[in-house]
Amino acid sequence: MAGLVNRSQHAPPRRRFKAVLEICGVLAIILSLGALVLAQSSSKSLPYQALVLTAAIPLPGVHGRFDHFAFDSAEPGRLFLAALGNDSLEIINLTGGARVHTITELGHPQGVVFASGLNKIFVASRDHQKLYIYDGAAYRLITAIDYHGDVDNLRYDAAAKRVYVDYGDGEKAAIGMVDATTNQRLADEYKTGSHAESFQLAETGPEMYVNLPQQSQIAVINRVTQAISRWPVTWKENFPMALDEADRRVFVGFRIPPRFAVFDMSSGKMVGALPCAADTDDLYYDSELKRIYVAGGQGFISVFQMKDPDHYELIANVPSGLGGRTAGYPRQPGKKGGPPHLFVAIPDRTGHGAEILSYVPVPSE
């Protein structure tokens, strides 16, 4: 860490844990209001503006918090947003910058992925405990798979055409798989021992990296042999995660305390950490600019610059909005070959409706 530059009793365990997290999140936001003003003021003295706000897409009639994004990179480009508090999936045309469709009655949707070659949308429903599969053209329901447990984060392996499904609690918690072509649930699954939050699939190997906040661990699962190793972590509520496979690094966001942490992918050793935006739920690694974007419900995006794989620097705290912890950063270039965009979903608040903010990264000079 020296190398980094500063800057209800009878409810199911998963529900109790979620309730505690939501209470903690609210308290964190309240306690962070003063810190937000300070962070925004101090960011003005940083070298340059790391992100430029280019658009705000309104979402009238959408209420409550958001969970996750997915993207369709084909022209004109679509954004899929799980509006958890609104029980809906909001679909945005990125060229027109407007909502084009809403799928309703999803029962607190959480994870969402889009299978581009198959034109299918997969949506995880927490309350219905199901994985819904929709046709991506007509938005028609194809089928639903019942997991009999909290269905949360999803990941899509485009090469294998498989959707990875994080579901369940305690001993029943696992990451299962669905054949995206046949829409069939596969028998194989990976037991995690507790409900997982963000997990990432390595592209250069069989590993899957999994945040397990209830156990204060990061699990590394070999998808071929099913062997599992576990890294203990010092802080609490490790939720978002991103990978830098070229430099063998795992980036993790913690909520208690608010920290951006870097782990060696081979050893599991934490090589450093820095304070970041509170109440984070998404973070992304920009391999071209060597940056990490950490979105926090505190109301800003912490931007970190990699100096080398062991050294990072906070270069900006970019204002967004209270509750803006849901973000998306598609790897593909923006529309018509333009720059990529960082999208942040902001819930509705007094005097202002829900919206999606779009930022363009600004390279350092």
Label for each model-derived stretch:
Residues 7-11, 33, 58:
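Helix-centric, low-specificity signal for extended rod-like, repetitive segments
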Residues 35-365:
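Predominantly soluble domains enriched in secretory-pathway, periplasmic, or organellar proteins
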Residues 6, 30, 39-43:
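Intrinsically disordered, low-complexity segments
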Residues 1-19:
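N-terminal secretory signal peptides that target proteins for export/translocation
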Residues 23-35:
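Bacterial N-terminal signal peptides
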Residues 12-15, 21, 25, 43, ...:
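Intrinsically disordered, low-complexity segments enriched in glycine/proline and serine/threonine
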Residues 11-13, 28, 63:
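Compositionally biased, intrinsically disordered low-complexity regions
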